[in-house]
């Protein structure tokens, strides 16, 4: 039985194959953005991780073989992460405590305090 081995590609051919795949990904993203009105709105926050260069042979530089690329081609209405975040946001209902007032809000932290009844009378006067 004959063994059909394909000849190994040269480094220049591997680089050319990589550049072709880079051009494909950029054209694919442009196509999605250009035709978003027909295809539907794509989620720009949650994508899929795919091999960036799936056609490269295994003996190509390992940094290219193992590289992944985030592809944002999931529609918003089909995005599981977006729907989960929407449910979380909708179901979150902060507990309103009576008498709890904001002392000040400093960006990341919000300080709240309870004012005593004497302080409340002074504020209303």
From Swiss-Prot:
This is Protein U2. Belongs to the nanovirus U2 protein family.
């Amino acid at each position: 039985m004959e063994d059909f081995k394909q000849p190994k590609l040269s480094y220049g051919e591997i680089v050319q194959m990589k550049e072709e795949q880079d051009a494909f990904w950029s054209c694919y993203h442009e196509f999605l953005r250009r035709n978003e009105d027909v295809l539907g709105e794509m989620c720009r926050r949650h994508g899929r991780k795919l091999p960036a260069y799936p056609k490269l042979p295994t003996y190509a530089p390992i940094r290219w073989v193992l590289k992944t690329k985030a592809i944002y081609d999931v529609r918003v209405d089909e995005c599981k992460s977006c729907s989960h975040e929407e449910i979380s946001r909708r179901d979150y209902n902060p507990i309103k405590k009576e008498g709890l007032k904001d002392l000040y809000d400093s960006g990341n932290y919000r300080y709240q305090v309870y004012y005593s009844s004497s302080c409340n009378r002074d504020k209303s006067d």
